[in-house]
């Protein structure tokens, strides 16, 4: 199982992939099942304190009951239930403080930045201006000061030093004079981040009941401040679980969960000035956040507030006429959602000592309802809506889904023979309704309603519907607790396919041999358990994506009814229908061994192969044809790997205990076949037959020319038959771009976790570490800091070793204003890392103390999440996503928290 760090945005969650890429363009997400019924709600709406157990089902046999929706694995969540007896009350409180979980990228300070920019201007004067090296320094300083390439603003208002630029930097050495003093120094990223944002959570639960009826009721509140100023997340939630044995032949129960989520968010994952993670990280250190007077002192308004500098005279690369810190306060991004989930079941039968013994009929119904509303507001004074005097967009969405199944089971044991048979029917329905409107033109700022704006610029509404109907069956058999066999068959019908291809047939078989229960093993006492298991099955997948969103009408043509044509209405076809579209199939083979040795060591090793055929993809088309693409079954892919689990009770049955759990996984991915053409290229990525999915595809660097400082590349010529010639070195970027090569992928060679749990009397300590070895990352932030050519952007400290003079030996080429760069293998960073993810220390007060004051138990805790990350590049988050790219996203946060847990 692989997880990403996800966004550090409060309330956001991580992504999960089970055993590699399941498809080329379909959803990779596993199915979440809560209390036996598939769950479509927000995972963040479930209070972790309400969860009793969580289990991951990986192979086809284990997940067969969940059909097509479980093709990418199943995560089973069971919530807490009540117990018979008197009412038990549990109270929990946690208080924490957060900070950045990863350090910042190493960038240049004011002096280093100006020295680097000077070198860039100087190189430009020599290469493009025809100026001699002896005079280029003086010319560079003049160009920095005035003219079309000036970067210091009017009258050098953005020169942070107490000398004019022509006096500040030596034109020969390129160094800032030693006696220069800073007039101001402000860090945009520091100004954007909150100092020690707080997190507090409170939970109260009540459980109890009789022998016949049991209940659990809980309430929770979470208040989490974001690391980025103005961002936050609040959650109010309640859960009620009831289970009742109504008669000796009828059991029934229900669970209901309500959650109110409220978020103030911020733009992320984009290279736009409205994204603070982009603008603040890339703002050169010479530009102040607040206006400065002639002496470099901050300017204040009549109310004593510092006046933001909106950069009217800043260069374009420094977000001219924009202050991204000000937009944190002046703009608004808010969402609210009400999440309601319900589960109801009734189970009839299993009458003892009758011919109906072992026969049960159960009915399960579960629904998930999400009503959400969001608002995006851009102020009229600063930012991207100044020209239209501000913008407001409001949107509402309603998601409703339900699953209804009826299951008939027969479970009997005859001597050493145990049979369990199941047949059932299931229906799943999903509906999504969306409505939004956008207006511009406000008389002044701070108005967050549509009525306050004057001009309607957009209005949109749409509805998505989706349904799946299934008939399912399963047979389990075991003999003498030694031999286990299972088989399942189901047929699923999906509304995403045309009627001729709507139904898919899927099946699985599996077996388990408990070798340790054989008579010939009876004398081997040090083997407590030894099992050999194997399974094979085929599951279906219909979850094709359109971009990052689900495509609910996969086989049909799409029409754009909002096509711009003055005041005339009409429709334009945007994608083609494909009635031949059919189920994607995942064939899973799993072979494993489980062992328990010396009553101390447990181990599991599994080898798996997952072959995907008829892969679903939104296939790209040439835009000249008038269509973006169409949906198609495009080929096949294979994942193979090994999962290893090792648990050791290093010390047990003593006052001090120590348990060590090691997890390790490998995965190898190969695209076996693509329809129509052997490869699909997208920027620096390629999907090619015979290679790993989403392989990096870039030019190959061949060093830096010591004489000129130019980047060199490996290239080759191709003859008329397409045969590649011998490689040679060139400085021609166009040639290098035409000679791209596969440079690896994000997929690691080995990844896993290490968990240590220590206990001594009332104390317990757990330390969870995760690791990944191998794979590569294309870090967009680092590469922009290193190769970005916009004047006004911050620069990486790595540029200190960039080429400057003939004879320099280095791996970083000369820097030059306006010079373009291409992505090479030098841009890829080793993705290996080791992270201490969680440290939890607890102390349970002695029970006799608690009993004396009427408490059952009391526990004190201290927890640290995202403690430290060790990797190959300071500032990089190699856990960001599964494809190996990084963007300007909300950094993950480290949280230190303290709590108390009382039961009475």
Which stretches of residues belong to each language-model region?
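Extracytoplasmic beta-strand/coil segments of soluble accessory domains associated
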Residues: 1-35, 53, 63-80
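Short beta-strands and strand-coil junctions in structured, solvent-facing domains, enriched
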Residues: 1-2, 23-25, 39-41, 60-65, ...
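Residues embedded in well-ordered regular secondary structure
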Residues: 1-14, 24-26, 30, 83-229, ...
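Short, glycine-/polar-rich solvent-exposed loops and beta-turns at beta-strand/coil boundaries
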Residues: 2-12, 44-49, 66-71, 231-234, ...
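Extracellular/periplasmic, surface-exposed regions of secreted and cell-surface proteins
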Residues: 28-29, 235, 241-250, 255-260, ...
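Conserved small-residue
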Residues: 90-177, 632, 651-746
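Glycine-rich, aromatic-lined ligand/substrate-binding cores of catalytic
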Residues: 745-778
